[in-house]
A protein has these predicted regions:
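Conserved NTP phosphate-binding and transfer environment spanning the P-loop NTPase/kinase superfamily
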Residues: 17-144
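Single conserved hydrophobic/aromatic residue that forms the stacking wall/gate
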Residues: 1-7, 12
Length: 144
């Protein structure tokens, strides 16, 4: 995504698609593209295989412009969502092996408690539509 101004309004000016095979972080072309674009959405084959659509890997996707185009509340909510998702990813092996000790990490405990709601929030049927206000309200509820 490459942004720019149209009059006094910020807008998406261009969209580019880069197809990588395997780990995109090892692909020099993908890394170069990430370095120059204002934002990128990373699609995950693993999410698609789990029937999670849209298959956007939130933790790998970035926006350099988010702080400039969203209200402080939305920025805070999105940051908290990402923090919970990152912590859950950090402890996933401990959860699978039964080695996580509840109460040892408040953020991890919250991530575990909200994981189902987060996954449901991030899924959307192809025919489903959701306006901005409805989406923000749903995000507040997930993190509530």
């Amino acid at each position: 995504i490459l942004s720019g101004l149209v009059g006094s309004e910020m807008c998406i000016r261009d969209r580019y698609t880069v197809l990588t095979e395997g780990d995109a972080s090892l692909d020099p072309v993908a890394e170069e593209v990430r370095s120059i674009l204002d934002g990128h959405l990373v699609l995950s084959a693993e999410l698609a295989q789990r029937n999670h659509f849209p298959a956007i890997d939130v933790l790998q996707s970035r926006s350099r412009l988010m702080d400039r185009v969203v209200e402080p509340e939305q920025r805070q909510l999105a940051g908290h969502l990402r923090a919970l998702m990152a912590r859950h990813a950090d402890i996933e092996l401990l959860l699978r092996t039964g080695d996580y000790v509840a109460g040892s990490d408040p953020l991890a405990d919250e991530a575990i408690a909200r994981q189902g709601a987060i996954e449901q929030f991030l899924r959307q049927d192809a025919a489903e539509t959701s306006g901005f206000d409805d989406t923000l309200r749903a995000l507040r509820k997930v993190l509530g």
